[in-house]
Structures are given as C-alpha cells and as structure tokens.
UniProtKB/Swiss-Prot annotation:
UniProt-listed PANTHER family: METHYLATED-DNA--PROTEIN-CYSTEINE METHYLTRANSFERASE
Protein name per Swiss-Prot or TrEMBL: Methylated-DNA--protein-cysteine methyltransferase
Assigned protein family: Belongs to the MGMT family.
Phosphoserine carried by residues: S14, S201
Pfam families, A to Z: DNA_binding_1, Methyltransf_1N
Species: Homo sapiens
Extra information: This enzyme catalyzes only one turnover and therefore is not strictly catalytic. According to one definition, an enzyme is a biocatalyst that acts repeatedly and over many reaction cycles.
Length: 207
C-alpha cells in the first residue's frame, strides 16, 4: 500500500449483506463482503439503495456503481468505474492483466471460462493461475470474478461462497447449468472470436 494513502472506509447494505468499501483519494482499494451469503432463490430481496455520502471520490463512485448494479442494472454502463489503487494494480503481473481483461471484456449478463480468460490474458495454459487471480481479486462484484465459470458448466469456486456466486449469476439472468460462455453476441464473444487471445494493456489512468 502507498504510504501516502489516507484510507477511508464506508459500508452499505446489499442483498448479500453488508459490503465494506475502503480506499483513498487516489482510488478504491477493496470491497469486502461482510454479510451472510444469500441463495439464488432470494434474488428478489433487495434493500433500498444506499445513500452516496461524502468521502474520497472513488468511494462515492463505487457506492453509486454498486447501487446501480443491484437496483438499475440496465443502466450500469452509465456509471463510471472508480480508479483502483490496491497494490495488485500498481505493478505489472499476470494477475493484474487477468483482472483488467475481466473488467473490460466480460460485461453484465456474460460469463467466461477460466481457460478462455487465460487465453485473453495471453497464456491459454494458465487456467489454474486465473483461478488464483480470482481468489486474489480485491474488488469483487466490480471486477466480476463471479462471471468466471468452469468449461464443464459447473459454477466453480468463489471467495465469497458458492451461494453468493449463484446469487450474482441469477441476478444477471443466468440459469445454472451449461453456460453459453462469453455470449457470441456480446463483447466477450467478439474478443474470443476475433482478438485471438492478445494480451493488450490496462486502460490509461488506472495505474
């Protein structure tokens, strides 16, 4: 962590229980799932949107983004993703590359396999390393590690618990079972067909 970071924290209620957001003026550091996990069957139980209070801009942006995710998912693309300042995003690594690809390519309502995501990050044989990157994701939901599933159609593991992953997928319209990986009409599908697993670079201003 940058020694100049003045860390601030805020919490908000969600269908998954309380979420704790932490960050500084330079960017968001973490999203922690504090509450008890829920089941996919409870997807209609959504608390009222959290108030967007004062604080570092990245925390306010993240609160607004999460409110949209849970309450206005059809408008999610209108809300900016906050700058990210966790140490994992401050230096080049395979984990950083995987997380950026996942954020930029796999959109709401899409899923991708561990192997496909490894290919997008430049190493098709690194599916296990992708799993490690998902476990180390400091900002779940925002960087959607819940959208990474097994090629077999199994949901796969999730740091927040299987019930949480199933809820998030159900919230995005997925039926559990064999998925249509990437979605041939979606951005992920376009990358998988046309990009040929090129690695690319993180977007400017996200260092």
């Amino acid at each position: 962590m940058d020694k100049d970071c003045e860390m601030k924290r805020t919490t908000l209620d969600s269908p998954l229980g309380k979420l704790e957001l932490s960050g500084c003026e330079q960017g968001l550091h973490e999203i922690k799932l504090l509450g008890k996990g829920t089941s996919a069957a409870d997807a209609v139980e959504v608390p009222a949107p959290a108030a967007v209070l004062g604080g570092p801009e990245p925390l306010m942006q993240c609160t607004a983004w999460l409110n949209a995710y849970f309450h206005q998912p059809e408008a999610i693309e209108e809300f900016p993703v906050p700058a990210l300042h966790h140490p994992v995003f401050q230096q080049e690594s395979f984990t950083r590359q995987v997380l950026w690809k996942l954020l930029k390519v796999v959109k709401f309502g899409e899923v991708i396999s561990y192997q496909q995501l490894a290919a997008l990050a430049g190493n098709p044989k690194a599916a296990r390393a992708v799993g490690g990157a998902m476990r180390g994701n400091p900002v779940p939901i925002l960087i959607p590690c819940h959208r990474v599933v097994c090629s077999s159609g199994a949901v796969g593991n999730y740091s927040g618990g299987l019930a949480v992953k199933e809820w998030l997928l159900a919230h995005e319209g997925h039926r559990l079972g064999k998925p249509g990986l990437g979605g041939s009409s979606g951005l992920a599908g376009a990358w998988l067909k046309g990009a040929g697993a090129t690695s690319g670079s993180p977007p400017a201003g996200r260092n």
